[in-house]
Amino acid sequence: MNNLLAVIELLKQNQVVAYPTESVFGLGCNPNNEEAIRQLLQLKNRPIEKGLILVAPTKELLLPYIDESQLTEKHWQRFDTITEQAVTWIMPVHKNVSHYLTGKFNTIAVRLCRVPAVVKLCESLGFALTSTSANFTGLPPCRTALEVKQQFGDHFPVLEAETGNRMNPSEIRDIFTQHIFRQG
C-alpha cells in the first residue's frame, strides 16, 4: 500500500477514491461531507434514492449513523458475527444522518469490513467510508486497481492494495427479520 498516505489525504480533503473491499473495489468518500457524497453519486451516475453502504472495521465507527435505541443485544450479536460471506446490514438510521446516505429509505446500510486496506484507512481517518462498487453503469465492478484505472482513468485516485478475494458482493440483510435483499 505504497500510496496509502496519499489516499488518506485525499479522503481528508473530501475527495472520492477507490479502495479494495471483500470482493471488488469500492468508491468511497467521507460520509459526513455532503459535497463529497454528491461528487461520488455524480461520478457513478447513481440516483440519490438508492442510498449508499457504509463500511468500517469496527462497530464504533458505524454507531453515529445507527439508531441504537431500536436494537437489542441479539441484534448486535448478529451484526458482530463474522461469516464467510460479507454481510451488509439494513439497520435503523440515526435521525441526524443525511438523506444522501439513506436515499429514499428510513434505514442505513452498514457493513463491518476487515479487509486490511479498509482497516488502515478507517483507523487513520477516524470515520467510516461510503461504499459502492467501482464501475460505470453497465460495466462489471473493478476487481483490481488496474481495472479501476482502465474505467476511471490513470489519474483517478485508487488505493493499490488487494481485495479480500471473495467472489460475490456482500449479501444485504435486514437486522430485524434477516430478510435477504441481495444474495451474496
UniProtKB/Swiss-Prot annotation:
The Enzyme Commission number assigned here is: 2.7.7.87
Q: Which GO terms describe its molecular function?
A: ATP binding; double-stranded RNA binding; L-threonylcarbamoyladenylate synthase; tRNA binding
- If you read the UniProt record, what top EC class would you report for this enzyme, in one word? transferase
Q: What does this protein do?
A: Required for the formation of a threonylcarbamoyl group on adenosine at position 37 (t(6)A37) in tRNAs that read codons beginning with adenine. Catalyzes the conversion of L-threonine, HCO(3)(-)/CO(2) and ATP to give threonylcarbamoyl-AMP (TC-AMP) as the acyladenylate intermediate, with the release of diphosphate.
Q: Name one Pfam family in it.
A: Sua5_yciO_yrdC
Identification of the protein by name: Threonylcarbamoyl-AMP synthase
KW Lipid metabolism (keyword) present:
no
The major lineage groups are:
Bacteria, Pseudomonadati, Pseudomonadota, Gammaproteobacteria, Pasteurellales
Q: Taking every annotated instance into account, which residue ranges of this chain make up the domain YrdC-like? A: 1-184
Q: Name one GO cellular component term.
A: cytoplasm
Q: Name one GO biological process term.
A: regulation of translational fidelity
Record's keyword terms, sorted: ATP-binding, Cytoplasm, Nucleotide-binding, Nucleotidyltransferase, Transferase, tRNA processing
Per UniProt, subcellular location reads as: Cytoplasm
Q: Which InterPro entries match?
A: DHBP_synth_RibB-like_a/b_dom, Sua5-like_dom, TC-AMP_synthase, TC-AMP_synthase_SUA5
What catalytic activity is recorded?
L-threonine + hydrogencarbonate + ATP = L-threonylcarbamoyladenylate + diphosphate + H2O
> Cross-referenced Gene3D superfamilies, in alphabetical order?
DHBP synthase (3.90.870.10)
